[in-house]
Amino acid sequence: MSKHFLNSYAQLLIQTCHQRGVLAMGGMAAQIPIKDDPAANELALGRVRADKLREVTDGHDGTWVAHPGLIELARGIFDARMSGPHQHAVRRDDVEVTAADLLKPSLGTITTAGFYGN
């Protein structure tokens, strides 16, 4: 969530869900384990770890992953940092998101390499 509008949306989602007493689910980790390339596999798993750590730290109550091989990784990160079944106490009253925050475009040039790397 390094883009301003994506981070704003995630913070607003947590705030809105918790104000209404519902679970705030994080996004899907699109990476999958890579069997035949240990270096690429560790890079992919590192991205998943960082993403799930950010989600639970921000206040998400759960998450989902694209591959069953990532369930234990994601579950371990959430279980280690949550004291119960949800984080409704994390109200995110500090968050003030405006329409401009949600509509702020990303800077940079659209490239083929960026498309494939996203």
Where are the regions that the model predicts?
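Expand to "…catalyze enediolate/carbanion chemistry for C-C bond making/breaking, isomerization
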Residues: M1-N118
